[in-house]
């Protein structure tokens, strides 16, 4: 039976972050994901790296400070999939007075270390404003955007780069302590193949299933309860041609973002709704759609209706239950619980957390685990560059560099590769000298060479992995085109698995 230093269960952002950090400190690491990387909460966020301006109202100063400081760290770690964005906050005096917002923004500017992101300012909305004419003033501040699913992917690739192992579609079915070690059982959900490992330590980073794995996988009492809070978003054709996002205040004191996305679209969200069902079955409700449309329409001149929605997505935030009365008041901070058996076989469990603070969460997790691993390496992730991030400049600069090296690339394709794969693009293009060398075009410039790369290097096994998480090609591909991808994948994955087996 193979023995690992650490087995991490859960392939979302926290699991991938902890696994990458541990592997980089010299531990032998295995990460297990029951479905696909980032298949739940971690691909259903607002796609922001932000301090969380509204958390200041709930006195979450530690969380906000840590998140603010992480923005510029993550921009340097993943410049191909993260970039700064300005946010405009229309002022509505009956909701929050200007002095309160100014104080909040002053704290936002100064709570975290900020060297490259510009500070907040007041703004006047003139005749060319996209907002309703009665909204004449507001504020503007800095946060950042990130491709959430690809941030998870980049961390999983880092696990492998540092000598670890990542298995997707491999469900951990049981874990128990035995003779000072963990015995972990798992099963391939496609083939039924059974696995058995020993591990010196175990991490439960299963997100919405963290308590369920305590109950059913380990038969241990969970140290904390969790509350599942659903957040839903709607996607519509681009509502304005400005680069800025908008943060809208609503009568219920909640806020809604309107975020420009991929040139053609705007993301509007999110909601905060208590959720009691299966996290895998989460979906938007009509009441949430109506809520988001109502908040948007109260602010913008361009009005939207149900028929304008081109896509929706929902996720469940597994928040540590602090007995708050309302979903929006529950802390977004994380709690790390660790316990062992006679000083051996530690179990570290993750409750809560935000996309923005995943790296610090992982660092704190390793601080708690370090005493169990004499000789473990030091913290290292703050100055690392994630796979794909070696672009030496901006995403636009790298797209131009790609077109110089591969002059057959269209501007849109070079931009897609730059913003999706960054410096890993050269694994896709190789020695190609024409578009014909990239193989079949499945639609919207989604070529066979890209899909091969996704299978070979990014754990893609299903169509939805490729077109909704590694990329967002699903926004453009027809049902017929998606069916063709499914056929191609079935044949290629089978061939891929046979070659690996041999």
Regions of interest found by a model, annotated:
Residues 142, 148-150, 158, 218-241, ...:
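C-terminal catalytic lobe of FAD-dependent flavoproteins
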Residues 2-14:
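Beta1/beta-strand and adjacent pyrophosphate-binding region of the FAD-binding site
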Residues 47-128:
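Dinucleotide-binding Rossmann-like beta1-alpha1 core, especially the glycine-rich loop
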Residues 168-182:
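A conserved short coil-to-beta-strand element within the FAD-binding core of flavoproteins
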Residues 204-219:
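Flavin (primarily FAD) binding-site architecture
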């Amino acid at each position: 039976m193979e023995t690992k230093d650490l087995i991490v269960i859960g392939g979302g952002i926290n699991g991938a972050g902890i696994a990458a950090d541990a592997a980089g400190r010299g531990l032998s690491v295995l990460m297990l994901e029951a479905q696909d990387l980032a298949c739940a909460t971690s691909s259903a966020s607002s796609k922001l790296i932000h301090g969380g301006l509204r958390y200041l109202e709930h006195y979450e100063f530690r969380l906000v400070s840590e998140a603010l400081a992480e923005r510029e760290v993550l921009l340097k770690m993943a410049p191909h999939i993260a970039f700064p964005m300005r946010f405009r906050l229309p002022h509505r005096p009956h909701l929050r007075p200007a002095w309160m917002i100014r104080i909040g923004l002053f704290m936002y500017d100064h709570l975290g270390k900020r060297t490259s992101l510009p500070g907040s300012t007041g703004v006047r909305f003139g005749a060319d404003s996209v907002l309703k004419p009665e909204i004449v003033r507001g504020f503007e501040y800095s946060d950042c955007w990130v491709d959430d699913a690809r941030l998870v992917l980049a961390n999983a690739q880092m696990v492998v780069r540092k000598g670890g192992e990542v298995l997707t579609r491999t469900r951990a079915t049981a874990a128990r302590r035995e003779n000072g070690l963990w015995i972990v059982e798992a099963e391939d959900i496609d083939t039924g193949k059974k696995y058995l490992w020993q591990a010196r330590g175990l991490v439960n980073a299963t997100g919405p299933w963290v308590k369920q794995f305590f109950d059913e996988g380990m038969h241990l009492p969970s140290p904390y309860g969790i509350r599942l809070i659903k957040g839903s978003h709607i996607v519509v054709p681009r509502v304005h041609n400005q680069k800025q996002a908008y943060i809208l205040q609503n009568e219920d004191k909640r806020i809604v973002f309107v975020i420009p996305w991929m040139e053609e679209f705007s993301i509007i969200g999110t909601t905060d709704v208590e959720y009691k069902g299966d996290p895998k079955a989460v979906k938007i409700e009509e009441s949430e759609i109506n809520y988001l449309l109502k908040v948007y329409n109260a602010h913008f001149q361009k009005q939207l209706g149900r028929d304008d929605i081109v896509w929706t997505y929902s996720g469940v935030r597994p928040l540590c239950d602090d007995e708050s009365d309302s979903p929006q008041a529950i802390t977004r901070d994380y709690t790390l619980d660790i316990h062992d058996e006679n000083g051996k076989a530690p179990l570290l469990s993750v409750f809560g957390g935000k996309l923005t603070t995943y790296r610090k969460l992982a660092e704190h997790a390793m601080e708690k685990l370090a005493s169990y691993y004499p000789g473990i390496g030091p913290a290292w992730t703050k100055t690392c560059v994630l796979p794909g991030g070696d672009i030496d400049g901006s995403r636009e600069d790298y797209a131009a560099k790609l077109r110089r090296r591969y002059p057959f690339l269209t501007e849109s394709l070079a931009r897609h590769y730059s913003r999706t794969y960054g410096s890993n693009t050269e694994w896709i293009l190789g020695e190609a000298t024409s578009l014909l060398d990239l193989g079949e075009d499945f639609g919207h410039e989604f070529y066979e060479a890209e899909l091969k790369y996704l299978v070979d290097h990014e754990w893609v096994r299903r169509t939805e992995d490729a077109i909704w998480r590694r990329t967002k090609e699903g926004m453009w591909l027809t049902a017929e085109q998606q069916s063709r991808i499914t056929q191609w994948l079935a044949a290629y994955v089978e061939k891929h698995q046979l070659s690996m087996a041999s």
